[in-house]
Swiss-Prot record:
GO terms, molecular function: alcohol-forming long-chain fatty acyl-CoA reductase activity; alcohol-forming very long-chain fatty acyl-CoA reductase activity; oxidoreductase activity, acting on the CH-CH group of donors, NAD or NADP as acceptor
Protein name: Fatty acyl-CoA reductase 2, chloroplastic
Enzyme Commission numbers on file: 1.2.1.84
Gene responsible for this protein: FAR2
Tissue-wise expression: Expressed in the tapetum of anthers.
Family: Belongs to the fatty acyl-CoA reductase family.
Domain of life, source organism: Eukaryota
Activity response to pH changes: Optimum pH is 6.
Cross-referenced InterPro entries: FAR, FAR_C, Far_NAD-bd, NAD(P)-bd_dom_sf
Compartments it resides in: Plastid, Chloroplast
């Protein structure tokens, strides 16, 4: 890009023939006159302003027209700018009076790190420098990867406030140390900072007690005031990810929580961006190619293909009241808890979502969109997040993610088949790629100048449309791994597995489970020497084993037979805006993933090391 020459005065107003868009109609520029650099400024094509939201924002220079002419003054109305310009005609005060200055011959590029479209790309690191973040869900898997990446790549970030559910400040600090700072994920930072690691981390990471389920997100008055004055970016990573959670519990954190956090965000004076970590599966039972579009309040997937007059609107407030009333009427015993779980599944499926988790997350997006006002919003929708691909090292994982119970049970010989469409696709993305895309989106939209009507930007971080992992291929990869690197039983003997059988029929799967359980228990061999009491015990064990496997399959069925493919065009364009250096350090090209290498050499070894702790 050649530089755009601008000045807020009525002189030195000459433009190059290329303009770089930063956000909507904003363009970055610099003033260079008589070989002196006057620094970057910006303008809004056709006028603008900051909409009154940020009184400290730099006032935009209103562009009356951009035109190409070398010999005469041409004036265009503000409504029809010509974007191919060597001469820039400005109306500095937006009053229709135009000024043209030409004759500047030498155009020099501005080398600032934050200019979009130039060699510096999005300027991710420069944006992070000196910024203050508020992150919820900070003790969770993805948030830890995000925190580690920020502190490793931009150690001069100012502060990261971590909203932690705890009874006291001391308890919050204890959770931070035990659940975050002691994690193996941070080993690279430990090596970098050595003995000063803990002091560095506690200087940057500020735990604050709170809960997004509460009003004002549960903050004490002094903490709320401090954060509202200082924070630049809010990241909501808090969620309940249990597919069949109690309806009231899931609504509280996944739907009401984002609304509470947005209410707090609107009090933040310097806020540049609100980022919601959602899931691609908020698209529910949609089929085919699913675009990166935000939800509006009342959207209902079950009826969205009907004629407009026949649509049934989803009333989020009514759903929250329904769950609250049901919880009040019930008791805390196991039967009532199951009823609340069943209620969530029933409500989700009636509106076109497969389970309580994705239904309540979708309603959380609706809450954000309907209450955001002039707060800029980015929604990140990853698919199934699994172990790190590369950073800070390959294979880091915490807890059993979506497909991991199946992977581990298969390796231990406890599961020899599963209910799945063999030709179907498991949409998987490594955690570090999700984090990289998140930081790229933050830099892109966090640097955008204030817009009176900021858009809500959606990025789906998913692999199914551009690099699908087919279930029958996954089964073969699992078999190849465990064939060469088997798990060990309690006696230290290798557990030999067979290629997993895939069933697209519930009846066939059930028959297989029962035969397999009997075979593994020895019931099929007759066992004439076993007394009747032992026989009954073995039959009971077989029955429980079959029930557990069928329960697991029932929960996963909407995903193992999922008919949608997540479009990621916005995400691809975001990546195209990055410099080559940024692509190396913050890459998220899911199309480049070699699934054979990732599954067999990265993900499963990571599971066995970090989840099983080497026990298998």
């Amino acid at each position: 890009m050649e530089a755009l020459f601008l000045s807020s005065s009525s002189s030195s107003i000459v433009a190059s023939n290329k303009l770089t868009r930063l956000h909507n109609h904003c363009v970055w520029s610099t003033v260079i006159r008589d070989k002196k650099r006057f620094g970057p400024t910006w303008c809004r094509v056709g006028g603008g302003g900051d909409g009154g939201r940020n009184s400290n924002a730099e006032r935009p220079i209103r562009v009356s027209s951009l035109l190409k002419d070398r010999g005469q003054v041409l004036i265009r109305e503000q409504s029809s700018p010509a974007m191919d310009a060597e001469t820039l005609v400005l109306s500095p005060n937006g009053n229709g009076r135009t000024i043209e200055i030409n004759g500047v011959k030498t155009l020099m590029p501005f080398s600032g790190a934050s200019m979009v479209g130039m060699k510096e790309g999005l300027g991710i690191i420069s944006f992070l420098q000196g910024k203050k973040f508020l992150i919820t869900g900070s003790t969770g898997f993805l948030a830890k990867v995000l925190i580690e990446k920020v502190l490793r790549m931009a150690p001069d970030v100012s502060k990261i406030y971590l909203l932690i559910k705890a009874k006291s400040k001391e308890a919050a600090i204890e959770r931070l140390k035990n659940e975050v700072l002691d994690a193996e994920l941070f080993n690279t930072l430990k090596e970098t900072h050595g003995a000063s690691y803990m002091s560095f981390m506690l200087t940057k990471l500020i735990p604050v007690t709170g809960n997004i389920c509460d009003s004002n997100i549960g903050l004490q008055a002094d903490s709320a005031e401090e954060i509202a004055k200082e924070v630049d970016v809010i990241i909501n990573s808090a969620a309940n990810t249990t597919f069949n959670e109690r309806y009231d519990v899931a609504l509280d954190i996944n739907t009401r929580g984002p609304g509470n956090l947005m209410g707090f965000a609107k009090k933040c004076k310097k806020l540049k961006l609100f980022l919601q970590v959602s899931t691609a599966y908020v698209n529910g039972q949609r089929q085919g190619r699913i675009m990166e579009k935000p939800f509006s309040m009342g959207d209902c997937i079950a009826t969205e293909n009907f004629l407009e007059g026949n649509r049934k609107a989803l009333d989020v407030d009514r759903e929250m009241k329904l769950a609250l009333e049901a919880a009040r009427k019930g008791t805390q015993n196991q039967d009532e808890a199951q009823k609340m779980k069943d209620l969530g599944l029933e409500r989700a499926r009636s509106y076109g979502w497969q389970d309580t988790y994705v239904f309540t997350k979708a309603m959380g997006e609706m809450m954000i969109n309907s209450t955001r006002g002039d707060v800029p919003v980015v929604i990140i929708r990853p698919s199934v997040i699994e172990s790190t691909y590369k950073d800070p090292f390959p294979g880091w994982m915490e807890g059993n993610r979506m497909m991991d119970p199946i992977v581990l049970c298969y390796g231990k010989g406890q599961l020899t088949g599963f209910l799945v469409d063999p030709k179907g696709v498991l949409d998987v993305v490594p955690a570090d790629m999700v984090v990289n895309a998140t930081l790229a989106a933050i830099a892109k939209h966090g640097m955008a100048m204030s817009d009176p009507e900021p858009e809500i930007n959606v990025y789906q971080i998913a692999s199914s449309a551009i690099n699908p992992l087919v279930f029958e291929d996954l089964a073969e990869l699992l078999y190849n791994h465990y064939k060469t690197s088997p798990c060990m039983d309690s006696k230290g003997d290798p557990i030999m597995v067979r290629l997993m059988k895939l069933f697209n029929s519930v009846d066939d799967f059930s028959d297989h489970l029962w035969r397999d359980a009997q075979e593994r228990s020895g019931l099929m061999s007759g066992m004439s020497s076993v007394d009747s009491k032992m026989m009954q015990k073995l039959k009971f064990i077989c029955k429980k084993s079959v029930e557990q496997a069928k329960h697991l399959a029932t929960i996963y069925e909407p995903y193992t037979f999922y008919g949608g493919r997540f479009d990621n065009s916005n995400t691809q364009r975001l990546m195209e805006n990055m410099s080559e250096d940024e692509k190396r350090e913050f890459g998220f090209d899911v199309g480049s993933i070699n699934w054979t290498d990732y599954i067999t050499n990265v993900h499963i070894p990571g599971l066995r090391r970090h989840v099983l702790k080497g026990r298998a």
